Amino acid sequence: MKLLAVRRLFRIQRVVIRYRLDDLLFDQPLLPWWLASLRLLMPWRWLPRKPTELSRGARLRLALQDLGPIFIKFGQLLSTRRDLLPPDIADELMLLQDRVPPFDPKKAVALIEEQLGAKVGEVFSRFDVEPLASASVAQVHAARLKTGEEVVVKVVRPGLKPVIAQDLAWLFLIAKAAERASADARRLHPVEIVGDYEKTIYDELDLLREAANASQLRRNFEDSELMYVPQVYWDLCRPKVLVMERIYGVPVTDMATLADQRTDMKLLAERGVEVFFTQVFRDSFFHADMHPGNIFVSTVKPWSPQYIAIDCGIVGSLTAEDQDYLARNLFAFFKRDYRRVAQLHIDSGWVPANTKVNEFEAAIRTVCEPIFEKPLKDISFGQVLMRLFQTARRFNMEVQPQLVLLQKTLLNIEGLGRQLYPDLDLWSTAKPYLERWMRDRYSPKAVFGNLHSQVEQLPHLAGMTRDLLERLSQPHLHDPQLPERRRQGDRWALRLLGAGLLGGGAVLAAGAAETASLAAPAAWPAWLMLAAGLYLIVRQ
């Protein structure tokens, strides 16, 4: 293992030298003297340099390709962090393709038989040894069940975990060194990015997780005209093997075939937007890897086209609070109410509570106002979110991983929609859906349903209120970097406090009604408690 690690280190060093990636660090201005002096200890920097026409982004992309699939997938993750990376580097990393040669089919068969505890011939009436597709984590084979259903069998590459662990160790080492060496690097949070990647890559190794995600999405869109998700055959799913229904559709980028079957392209593009907002706001569970390779179009009703989604390994979800603030931010942005946008960021806890609203508002206006020079139909929701994240980072916003997944997915959906139908007006398509969601969220039925669920938490009210008051009495807990989970806890405590006030007010009101009139002065405390409780619940 140590020998492999040393060999890998030399491989990384050769790639760094070949593409002069050290320039990305050492050619930065205002380097600490001790770091700048390290250049003298690198012999290759003394040698004459061959002129190159490659940009820094292209050199980084080629280096990641040379380092193999784990680094390629890391580069793909980086390409989604446009709130962090310079545009030239992000654009180049978007070109990375997760395509690797297939592994030996005999190994795939052996792994399937080991996982299922049966011979392939006992489970499938036909199994194609030539894979349909091959990527860095798994490859896919076509097969037919004994009962006649056509399926695909996804198999994790054997021996992948040690390789991933080794490459992740080097990525963490590089990230930590970059954070120590450069203020610009610290602003990009490289260790945090590698940590997010570690979670993502290990999640992708567990095919039971992908099967569960697919089942949830299928249930969410059952009998829907918008999207179809293939059936999972749970009896044949294991941590390293996934068996799903085989679908036959047109790749969403195959414009010629879609045109030949007279697909309604405008409706298809609009339904893509509706699929996104349905997942985010109705279900709070969204497919977060909706690039064109994972999306097909059904051939059944071209006049009423339906999407088919595959590869559900990466999903995202939003809290009710994030859903609410996201919708309000979009409405405020399109009204050019930048003060409202700034205040919403502060209220949501996305930026520290001590942020100066006027300064934040001015920064948002400076970044976002040029966007409105374009026609409304050309404005990108994904770009709006990216610009807001970039601005908010200057005010110490910690962008939650789920919001990054959301922004990445939105960019994919937008790009796809405008490729299908260039005149797609995203805001006109999304606005009615958002308005309907906001109306439903604040309808009397929803408010009282929310109240009922929170009244059930009344037994915990005393303890949570005491904890909240203790935290508020300790100044050091007002740190701008207060973890999100503590902010969420505070919100829940305030909701429960509101529920308690409502309950107490109802008791007082009932007593006042028996002894006097609800309009009498004796009933005023009850009305005050009811009003305060309702305010706390709705406000939170």
UniProtKB/Swiss-Prot annotation:
Residues holding ATP: L132, A133, S134, A135, S136, V137, A138, Q139, V140, K154
InterPro entries for the chain: ABC1_dom, Kinase-like_dom_sf, UbiB, UbiB_bact, UbiB_kinase
A Pfam short name: ABC1
Cell compartments where the protein resides: Cell inner membrane
Domain of life the protein comes from: Bacteria
Entry EC no(s): 2.7.-.-
Recorded metabolic or biological pathway in which this protein acts: Cofactor biosynthesis; ubiquinone biosynthesis [regulation]
Recorded GO CC terms: plasma membrane
Domain called Protein kinase: residue spans: 126-494
Record carries keyword 4Fe-4S: no
Membrane-topology annotation of the record: Multi-pass membrane protein
EC category name: transferase
SUPFAM superfamilies: Protein kinase-like (PK-like)
Transmembrane segments: 24-44, 496-516, 518-538
Active site (record annotation): D289 (proton acceptor)
Entry keyword annotation includes Kinase: yes
Record's keyword terms, sorted: ATP-binding, Cell inner membrane, Cell membrane, Kinase, Membrane, Nucleotide-binding, Transferase, Transmembrane, Transmembrane helix, Ubiquinone biosynthesis
A GO biological-process term: ubiquinone biosynthetic process
Molecular function per GO: ATP binding; protein kinase activity
HAMAP family according to UniProt: UbiB
Main function: Is probably a protein kinase regulator of UbiI activity which is involved in aerobic coenzyme Q (ubiquinone) biosynthesis.
Recorded family membership: Belongs to the ABC1 family. UbiB subfamily.
Protein name as annotated: Probable protein kinase UbiB
Organism: Pseudomonas putida (strain ATCC 700007 / DSM 6899 / JCM 31910 / BCRC 17059 / LMG 24140 / F1)
Gene expressing this chain: ubiB
